[in-house]
Each structure stands twice: as C-alpha cells, then as structure tokens.
Regions:
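Substrate-binding/active-site clefts of carbohydrate-active enzymes
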Residues: 1-130, 135-162, 181
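Conserved alpha/beta catalytic core and glycan-binding cleft of carbohydrate-active enzymes
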Residues: 130, 143-147, 151-230
Length: 230
C-alpha cells in the first residue's frame, strides 16, 4: 500500500502523501504548510514559486486529471459522483467504471463539462501561481472518448494547445496509461505538446547503474529521441 510507511521517528509512523489521489484540483495540499494558521497554503506556495523564479528555476506542476480519489463504483462520494456521475466518469454499459487509470475510475476528459473544468483549473494555476508548465500524469487518458476508445484528434488536447492563456506554458504528456494505450512518439497533439519518454528514462538509468547489457537501448534512446520527448 503506497499510503503506508513502516519507518518511524520517535515511535511515530510516517505517512507518505504522493498527491495523486486528487479531491480538489484547485487546492494546494495544506499538510505542506509551515504556518499554524489556516488557509496559508496558497500564500506559502506563491512565495516558494517566486523564490524559485528569482533564482532562475522554472516550476512544472504535475497534474493528475486521469482519475480522482472517489475510487470505483463502490468508493466514497466526495464531489463528482454526487454532481453528475454519468458526466464526470467513463462508465461501462452496465454502469461500472472503466479503469484506464489503475486507480478505480477514469475521468471523462473529453466531455464538454470536464474539458471546461480542466481548462479552468490550468488557467487558475497559470494566472494565480505563475507556474511555468504542466506535466500530465497518464496523459493518454486525456485522448480517450467517452466509451474509452482512443481519439485521433481529441477536443481536450486541442483546446489546451490553442488556449491563449496557456500559450506560454509548457505542456508535457506522460504518453501512456494503465489501460495499455502507449503513445510515446505518437501522442495525438500538435507540436505544442512535449512527451515524457519512459523508455529513455528506464534504459539510461539502467545503463548508468552498470547494466552493460542495456547499452544498445540506452544509445538508441539518446540518438533516436526528438527534442520534444522529455
């Protein structure tokens, strides 16, 4: 269980917080704040981002629009299930959840309502926090239709690429999902999007660790990858 950690400090168990089970897409995690007062997480994060910018460091926000913390059809109801389950989630013909995320549910990203939610969220982080870009977790889900089938020209990806407010931020796709859709080198978006290249990462890391048998794959990954594959 990724939420548990057996390590202890002074007998107290430490708990991991990966931030990948989103409840509020517009809200920073309050557990990271230093202040004792409530509602300081936004102020502290803005201060951190400004300090990084002042030192020439860009801030790329890792966003997870492929699923939520509400789990599968037997999971808790926090928000979207109660608002309109049929709109916000991809449902099978028998009313269960498609699970292309590996987390129990899959956001219905190309429904107009969900598209608008994602667009407004990215605009919010761009305008209010001045982040420099976004890395989209399991981004192939962003290109699936309401029935789960891959789309050639997904409306959401096109909308984000063409939006004037997002025109100066980086858009980086982790171009696969847990449903087997692997799109590194063929992500269905314009040159506006870069791709997260998992093969490059894995093969080069393996080679640097001393796995000489992986030298060819590491060399191929370096020489064959284009500059838009991060």
């Amino acid at each position: 269980d990724e939420t548990m950690n057996s390590r202890t400090v002074d007998g107290k168990q430490l708990l991991e917080c990966w931030g990948y089970n989103t409840v509020g897409f517009f809200a920073p995690n309050s557990s990271y704040t230093a202040a004792n007062e409530h509602n300081q997480e936004g102020t502290e994060l803005k201060t951190l981002i400004k300090a990084l910018h002042d030192n020439g460091i860009e801030v790329i926000l890792d966003v997870v629009f492929n699923h939520t913390a509400e789990g599968n059809e037997k999971g808790n109801t926090f928000s979207f299930k109660g608002f309109d389950n049929n709109i916000y989630y991809m449902l099978t013909p028998d009313g269960n959840y498609y699970n292309f995320s590996g987390c129990g549910n899959t956001l219905n990203c190309n429904h107009p309502v969900v598209q608008q939610l994602i667009l407004e969220c990215l605009r919010y982080w761009t305008i209010n926090y001045r982040v420099d870009g976004f890395r989209f977790d399991l981004a192939s889900i962003l290109g699936r239709n309401e029935d789960g089938s891959p789309m050639n020209n997904p409306p959401l990806l096109r909308t984000l690429a063409d939006d004037s407010i997002l025109s100066n931020v980086k858009l980086i796709a982790e171009a696969w999902d847990a449903g087997g859709l692997y799109q590194v080198g063929s992500f269905p978006a314009s040159g506006r999007w870069a791709e997260w290249n998992g093969r490059y990462r894995d093969s080069l890391r393996s080679y640097l660790k001393g796995d000489s048998w992986n030298a060819w794959d590491a060399a191929w990954s370096i020489s064959a990858v284009s500059y838009t594959h991060l």
